[in-house]
């Protein structure tokens, strides 16, 4: 049996991820009028642009929902966000500035928690507003079926009858008005925005053009730091971790991780920290472009990675970065709870994060401009006396020790020379004058 329904299942319980916006409001009312028993579920993800969460379920009931629930997802979202920081699960970056996968993290939490709530209410059909060209249709599909194997999927935006009758925002607005709901369309922005407590995504419309950039965006979690009339003062902030968990900001300890994240967002947001412009590969391998905000994620990530580099050895750091790239891609693809992702994630949390205890002090300026002022940790393996250029007592090694170490390198150097000679004879290298490879004397003549 197909899990995707192409037309509305009349007379059955259908759950809809309800945002309260025009699209989902029109979809809910339309499904009700066509004979479905509609249940509305709203995820409280701490969206910074949402003024009143309690109003959303009330709207759903007005539009004909059998039941409307507000599901608080904030604690779980922050839990997953911290896990992503611990594992470095960020695979998209430009010029060293990362996209913190805030939308994929939000989808992982929304997809599992809303479907769990639906299952409690005996609702085994789920609809949402994702379109067939985006990533979310696949993310929600995976997370929904992982949570409820009996789930069937109905998306109004894949139903040709819905598209024919309510194919655009003007048609939806007229439909709502005709039904007695004076639903006024919000003014159209030059881009669309999706947000949660961890970050905001701005994309589509004018932002699809690469000659239209960050300057057309009105940040919702920070400040437009690129504007001359935007005053941004330098600020010092201290971030403390214990066993890989962020616990304090500027000496204030937080028992509630959600409260800590809200404060981290406020601090980073005052500077526009964590804003980035990325070109990425969607799940279907087509490229898309987004402008992202993630002030709290960026602040915690910077401090965490500073401690990682001061505590762990080179091979561990290398594995952390390689695994983090892979895990970030799995997260982006909607596979955050797949076994291969759990394996990578738990490894980083167990063998990297558990050693991360300490405090990092930074000076934040404009945007992603910052300086690290101090790093403290009882677990630091950074020991300046080991490599001090000054004369020290009880030096860890002597000139004679280094001579012996370099002599051992002769084995590797000899082998490397032999390989280069093979490559040169095969025509793969041009050695000598006019080449970037220096002329090498062959041991064999």
From Swiss-Prot:
Keywords: Amino-acid biosynthesis, Arginine biosynthesis, ATP-binding, Cytoplasm, Ligase, Nucleotide-binding. This is Argininosuccinate synthase. GO terms for biological process: argininosuccinate metabolic process; L-arginine biosynthetic process; urea cycle. Its EC number is 6.3.4.5. Its main location: cytoplasm. The gene is argG. It catalyses: L-citrulline + L-aspartate + ATP = 2-(N(omega)-L-arginino)succinate + AMP + diphosphate + H(+). ATP binds at residues 17-25, 43, 129, 131, 136, 194. One of its GO terms (cellular component) is cytoplasm. The lineage of its organism: Bacteria, Pseudomonadati, Pseudomonadota, Alphaproteobacteria, Hyphomicrobiales. L-citrulline binds at residues 99, 135, 139, 192, 201, 203, 280. GO terms for molecular function: argininosuccinate synthase activity; ATP binding; protein homodimerization activity. The keyword ATP-binding applies. Belongs to the argininosuccinate synthase family. Type 2 subfamily. It comes from Rhodopseudomonas palustris (strain BisA53).
């Amino acid at each position: 049996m197909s899990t995707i329904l192409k037309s509305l299942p009349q007379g059955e319980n259908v759950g809809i991820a309800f945002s309260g916006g025009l699209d989902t409001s029109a979809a809910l009312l339309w499904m009700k009028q066509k004979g479905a028993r509609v249940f509305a579920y709203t995820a409280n993800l701490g969206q910074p642009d949402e003024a009143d969460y309690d109003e959303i379920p009330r709207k759903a009931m007005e539009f004909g929902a059998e039941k409307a629930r507000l599901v608080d997802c904030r604690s779980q979202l922050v839990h997953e966000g911290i896990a992503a920081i611990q594992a470095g699960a960020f695979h998209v970056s430009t010029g060293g500035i990362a996209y913190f996968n805030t939308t994929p993290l939000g989808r992982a939490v929304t997809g599992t928690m809303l479907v769990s709530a639906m299952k409690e209410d005996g609702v085994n059909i789920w609809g949402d507003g994702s379109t067939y060209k985006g990533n979310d249709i696949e993310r929600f599909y995976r997370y929904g079926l992982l949570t409820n194997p009996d789930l069937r999927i109905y998306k109004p935006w894949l139903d040709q009858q819905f598209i024919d009758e309510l194919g655009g925002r003007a048609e939806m607005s007229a439909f709502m008005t005709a039904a007695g709901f004076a639903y006024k369309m919000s003014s159209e922005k030059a881009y669309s925005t999706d947000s949660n407590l961890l970050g905001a995504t701005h994309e589509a419309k004018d932002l699809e053009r690469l000659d239209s950039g960050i300057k057309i965006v009105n940040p919702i979690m920070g400040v437009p730091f690129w504007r001359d009339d935007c005053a941004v003062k330098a600020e010092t902030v201290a971030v403390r971790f214990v066993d890989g968990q962020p616990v304090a900001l500027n000496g204030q300890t937080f028992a509630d991780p959600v409260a800590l994240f809200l404060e981290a967002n406020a601090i980073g947001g005052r500077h526009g920290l964590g804003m980035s412009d990325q070109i990425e590969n969607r799940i279907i391998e087509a490229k898309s472009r987004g402008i992202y905000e993630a002030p709290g994620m960026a602040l915690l990530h910077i401090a965490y990675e500073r401690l990682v580099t001061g505590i762990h050895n080179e091979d561990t750091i290398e594995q952390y970065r390689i695994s983090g790239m892979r895990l970030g891609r799995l997260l982006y693809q909607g596979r955050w709870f797949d076994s291969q992702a759990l394996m990578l994630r738990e490894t980083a949390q167990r063998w990297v994060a558990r050693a991360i205890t300490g405090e990092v002090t930074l000076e934040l300026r404009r945007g992603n401009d910052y300086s690290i002022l101090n790093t403290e940790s009882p677990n630091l393996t950074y020991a300046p006396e080991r490599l001090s250029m000054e004369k020290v007592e009880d030096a860890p090694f002597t000139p004679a020790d280094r001579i012996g170490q370099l002599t051992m390198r002769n084995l590797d150097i000899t082998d490397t020379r032999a390989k280069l000679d093979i490559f040169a004879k095969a025509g793969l290298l041009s050695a000598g004058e006019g080449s970037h490879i220096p002329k090498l004397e062959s041991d064999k003549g």
